[in-house]
Amino acid sequence: RSRGLGDVYKRQVVLLSAAMCVAALGGCGSKAGSSSDSSKKTAENSSKEDDQKAADEVAKKIDAIYVQERNDKTDEQCKEAKEAWDKLTDAQKELVEGENADPDYFGRDTGDASQDDPLNEDNIGEKELLVVSFGTSFNASRAADIGGVEKALQVANPDWSVRRAFTAQIIINHVQARDGEKIDNMDQALERAVKNGVKKLVVQPTHLMHGAEYDELTETVNSYKDKFESVKIAEPLLGEVGADATAINEDKAAVAKAITAEAVKTAEYDSLDAAAEDSTAFVFMGHGTSHTAKISYSQMQAQMEPVSYTHLTLP
């Protein structure tokens, strides 16, 4: 019996020792796994930090040119911003966020920039028709709308050289940085005209009315007046502002008829009367302005009334 109990005791000791070894080995394995997981998380965090750092650097470069007035560093900064963007991964591009910067600055598809002609070449001649627009960074719209106006003016005035200028440097910088297309601002366009020996200059704005942009345009052009034999600045689309809210003119009448006809056509009615009979009203909306020219909206509303556009309104 003594030997039997001893054998049992020995077996228990052996089993307990084996269990302790297994537990010890299991514990060692758990620590190793925990260490591996920790290293993996550290690497992931480090990678995320690196991604954000790269994105932040691009955001700084975009912010630097976003609202920058043109200077001797603009060209290089536009180039550097785009090159830095191109080096980012798709995931890093989504992280770009600054005061003004976001992924759309370089990442949004607005059409083929090569379809747009910036009209910034020399060999102008003595007569120039300078078409001045606020501008847009949407390539397809710029080519079709602004480019369409420029082309129409060139066809109508074959003896004149048509050139382009934008008043919004924020747009000029954006297009140059993203697409490599250089568009003249007002000073660049006027300096180009002087350099090319232009004698007769006609400035045709595509602006809607006598607002802040138009005021700045006329101020800039007037500062160059003594460099040309003659300078003429055309009225904006809605013509002169007028004395009060009831003042209307031929320009406003032409615009009222044109936009009404287009609205009726787009709504697929045969006539304005047909739209009225169908209880359809048209509402035309403007951007609005704090400039004194805001009265132009009231004048356009007044313009609708004499031609029986009773179901047309401008809010």
Name each model feature, range by range:
Residues 26-37:
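Bacterial lipoprotein signal-peptidase II cleavage site
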Residues 1-9, 311-315:
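Single conserved hydrophobic/aromatic residue that forms the stacking wall/gate
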